[in-house]
Amino acid sequence: MSKECIFCGKKPQVGNLVSHSNIKTKRRFNPNLQRVRHQFADGSVRTLTVCTRCLRSGVVTKPLVRKQG
């Protein structure tokens, strides 16, 4: 799974982990990415890696779930 949002391009960032004695070591801040089925304008459906901000803002259009039988 890629660590980048398909729509906004959000990816991991580098920062510092700061201890009580103010010693700094490098760490990574990973975005909250989810794998979601997305329906495109032509009707095709693909599974994409999307951040939760894009999910909440309505960028992703989920396909209709049809009942069997």
Swiss-Prot record:
The entry's keywords: Ribonucleoprotein, Ribosomal protein
Gene Ontology MF, one: structural constituent of ribosome
Domain of life where this protein originates: Bacteria
GO biological process per UniProt: translation
One cellular component term from this protein's GO annotations in UniProt: ribosome
Record-linked InterPro entries: Bacterial_rp_bL28 (IPR050096), Ribosomal_bL28 (IPR026569), Ribosomal_bL28/bL31-like_sf (IPR034704), Ribosomal_bL28_bact-type (IPR001383), Ribosomal_bL28_sf (IPR037147)
Homology family: Belongs to the bacterial ribosomal protein bL28 family.
The protein, known as: Large ribosomal subunit protein bL28
Record organism: Desulfovibrio desulfuricans (strain ATCC 27774 / DSM 6949 / MB)
Gene of this entry: rpmB
